[in-house]
């Protein structure tokens, strides 16, 4: 278990030294490209899309125009920003549509993209347009995850990430701090990253 050090500035200095040693002093600007404001699940306690589900009568109208998505990718390329991932709520686009969007973005930017579009069992449909798959773990505590994201099974997320690795994709997870986790949960998070061979958090 990690104990809180009384001198936080020493910890920050040590973290900075470690970061510079491991990653250098260059940073990149990244932007997530959102595909839609609709999510079929719509019950994650922290998510804006959860506040919109009952207000959206026709989910197709909450989808972004794909040409606007492509224009955003072109702007990212011209600004030399990385695209963090494509993000969209559950059932906002089909797998075939996501594949087409990702392929076009790869053609625009010259780089494959990460996906953060929910749990899927259709990963084999994707190819070189996809760099990696992101699992929305969100909370570093399984019991709290069940309360915060009741419709997103942590077991299904974990299985999807393992399958993604078997198919040759890189793997990432999203974790949001401040949803009720404690320092005791850090050990669980570190073990999760190791057990599922996560490339990026």
Where are these predicted regions, by residue range?
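An N-cap/entry alpha-helix motif that binds or orients negatively charged groups
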Residues: 1-30
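Short, well-ordered coil/turn segments that N-cap beta-strands
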Residues: 21-27, 80-82, 109-113, 129-131, ...
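Canonical Radical SAM [4Fe-4S] cluster-binding loop centered on the CxxxCxxC motif
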Residues: 21-68
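Glycine-rich, proline-tolerant flexible connector loops at the mouths of alpha/beta enzymes
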Residues: 30-33, 54-57, 84-96, 144-145
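Non-cysteine beta-strand/loop elements that form the S-adenosyl-L-methionine
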Residues: 44, 127-141, 198-201
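Canonical radical SAM enzyme core domain
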Residues: 55-69, 92-128, 137-139, 177-185
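Short Fe-S-cluster ligation motifs
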Residues: 68-89
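Conserved C-terminal portion of the radical SAM core fold
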Residues: 83-86, 132, 155-201
């Amino acid at each position: 278990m990690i104990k809180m050090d009384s001198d936080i500035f020493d910890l920050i200095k040590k973290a900075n030294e470690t970061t510079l040693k491991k990653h250098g002093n260059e940073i990149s600007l990244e932007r997530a490209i959102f595909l839609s404001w609709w999510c079929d699940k719509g019950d994650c306690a922290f998510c804006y899309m959860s506040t919109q589900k009952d207000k959206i009568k026709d989910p197709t109208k909450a989808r972004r125009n794909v040409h606007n998505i492509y224009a955003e990718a072109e702007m990212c390329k011209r600004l030399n920003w990385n695209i963090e991932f494509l993000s969209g709520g559950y059932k906002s686009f089909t797998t075939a549509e996501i594949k087409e969007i990702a392929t076009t973005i790869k053609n625009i930017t010259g780089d494959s993209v990460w996906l953060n579009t929910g749990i899927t069992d259709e990963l084999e449909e994707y190819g070189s347009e996809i760099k990696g798959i992101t699992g929305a773990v969100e909370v570093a505590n399984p019991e709290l995850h069940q309360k915060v994201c009741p419709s997103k099974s942590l077991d299904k997320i974990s299985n999807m990430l393992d399958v993604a690795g078997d198919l040759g994709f890189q793997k990432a997870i999203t974790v949001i701090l401040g949803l009720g986790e404690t320092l005791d949960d850090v050990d669980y998070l570190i073990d999760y990253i190791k057990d599922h061979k996560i490339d990026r958090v």
